[in-house]
Amino acid sequence: MSGGVKLIAGLGNPGDQYARTRHNVGAWFLETLAQQRNQSLAKENKFHGFVAKCNDYWLLKPTTFMNESGQAVAALARFYKIKPSEILIAHDELDFPAGDIRLKEGGGHGGHNGLRNIIQHLGSSDFYRLRIGINHPGHKDRVTPYVLSPPSENDRIAILAAIEKGLRLIPELVQGDFQKVMRELHS
């Protein structure tokens, strides 16, 4: 993959009942980024989400449910001719402790339905993922209620700190300095 990020999407489910849940930490990331950049996210039905143009890149918060996120990402990417390798998806990651944040280049969906749908709609898995740790409930049967509930206060604080760490590296992501981002996040 080459070039910098031209589209940053933050995954989550729409509606107030999901806004503070673990599954929405990608949306938390995107909303915080928009606030820091003084950008207002405007609803764009043709992109199935809230959108803002921020210098040389787009911000996208899908209005679809998580498992249909690919509609929004693919619609905006195709309209603006953004390649999968120029896309960054911020999402919740069960396999990392709350407070961990890592950048991944390409790969599978790892059981994440939002990523699965994005891969399906883009026809490619060659996009970047900003994986924000939320902990694992311990057993697969508890995953759905776990991700659809708010984190504990300690986990919420750790998740917000991870988001801040990721936000500080947006300039490097936009410039395409992915190795520097990985060094910063993974050390």
Curated annotation (Swiss-Prot):
Name of the protein in its database record: Peptidyl-tRNA hydrolase
Site (Stabilizes the basic form of H active site to accept a proton): D92
Residues annotated as site: Discriminates between blocked and unblocked aminoacyl-tRNA: N13
Lineage of the organism: Bacteria, Pseudomonadati, Pseudomonadota, Gammaproteobacteria, Legionellales
Gene: pth
Entry annotated with the keyword Nucleotide-binding: no
Broad class of the protein's primary localization: cytoplasm
InterPro entries given in the database record: Pept_tRNA_hydro, Pept_tRNA_hydro_CS, Pept_tRNA_hydro_sf
Enzyme Commission no: 3.1.1.29
Subcellular location: Cytoplasm
GO CC terms in record: cytoplasm
Keywords: Cytoplasm, Hydrolase, RNA-binding, tRNA-binding
